[in-house]
């Protein structure tokens, strides 16, 4: 890494997850990691694997995913951004490129992550909305959604709403923000936490929708949170979920296992 021009680059990227089998490289299927590594390889990148802030499942999108790569690049960060975007497929885009210290780790240095989930209320399926939102009809009661969302704020054992990637792994997470907003044709959920369990965001959305529809009580949700007993929840569809932003406060946090949403 001592050669002139070699530096660690932080990439902020966005992608439409619809036609990807998730972010992580796996076999011959199309993934965000495989596309980005192939493109970086054309620009002289030689590492074995890219590092990402968080893993996203098949069909999940991102508007603020973070990756790092070490590259011997003789031009500006802006030029690298342009060179990558000229070569990447239409459903992936690099929004920003900057150099970071060699020790920077996109996952372990993240202080929190923020996910958004979009629901639209229409009696008939809208093809132009379907890639990025979950259609629910009749419309949900926003007040009930907000009532349920507040329960999740704070430090809790979320084992009823997701699982650790490793057996016996820590299932305690701290949620800083959990709230719903009305949109023109539905609502949007925003959640920020220090980290997430496997499928945690989509399970939380599903449970809140069930409560808003009268399928479960607030007591059921509180009990699930207090006792870690699964509510046997389903999963909200991947298409409504976006990894919106990864926050860094300059401190390295404890190394929680990777989460997938």
Outline where the language-model segments fall.
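Structured-RNA-binding interfaces characteristic of tRNA pseudouridine synthases
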Residues: 2-261
């Amino acid at each position: 890494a001592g050669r002139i021009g070699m530096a660690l680059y932080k990439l902020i990227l966005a992608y439409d997850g619809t036609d990807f089998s998730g972010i992580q490289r796996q076999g011959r299927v199309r993934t965000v990691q495989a596309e980005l590594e192939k493109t970086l390889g054309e620009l002289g990148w030689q590492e074995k694997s890219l590092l990402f802030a968080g893993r996203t499942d098949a069909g999940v999108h991102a508007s603020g995913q973070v990756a790092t790569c070490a590259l011997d690049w003789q031009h500006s960060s802006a030029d690298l951004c342009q060179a990558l975007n000229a070569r990447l497929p239409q459903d992936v885009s690099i929004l920003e490129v900057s150099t970071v210290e060699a020790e920077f780790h996109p996952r372990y240095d993240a202080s929190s992550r923020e996910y958004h989930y979009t629901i639209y209320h229409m009696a008939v399926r809208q093809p132009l909305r379907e890639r990025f939102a979950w259609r629910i009809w009749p419309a949900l009661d926003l007040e009930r959604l907000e009532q349920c969302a507040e329960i999740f704020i704070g430090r809790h054992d979320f084992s009823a709403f997701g699982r650790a990637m490793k057996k016996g792994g820590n299932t305690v997470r701290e949620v800083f923000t959990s709230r719903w907003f009305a949109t023109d044709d539905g609502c949007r959920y925003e959640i920020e936490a220090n980290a997430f369990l496997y499928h945690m965001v989509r399970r939380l959305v599903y449970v809140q929708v069930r409560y808003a529809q009268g399928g479960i009580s607030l007591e059921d949700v509180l009990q699930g949170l207090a006792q870690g007993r699964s509510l046997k929840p389903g999963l909200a569809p991947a298409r409504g979920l976006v990894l919106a932003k990864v926050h860094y406060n300059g401190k390295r946090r404890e190394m929680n296992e990777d989460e997938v949403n």
